[in-house]
Amino acid sequence: MSSLDKTMHFDFNQNKGKNVYDTLQDVYNALEEKGYNPVNQIVGYLLSGDPAYIPRHNDARNLILKHERDEIIEELVKSYLGKNK
């Protein structure tokens, strides 16, 4: 039986990776290491959707692209308002 005949099982949670908080911490640190203003760069990315605002340094760009922008904004608003439920 070839591998094409087998049903594959996909576990979304297994492939989820880091949560938004951890990702933003890593991206923030990478931006600081490169000498950028992290807040300005992250805001630029969130408003425009252009990943060029985030450097490839320490894989920051790939990390942030694993999350939808609306998911990141939702987490930021919840955190800002203290509603992490």
Curated annotation (Swiss-Prot):
Family from the record: Belongs to the UPF0297 family.
Name under which the protein is recorded: UPF0297 protein lhv_0439
Xref: Pfam families: IreB
Provenance organism: Lactobacillus helveticus (strain DPC 4571)
Domain of life where this protein originates: Bacteria
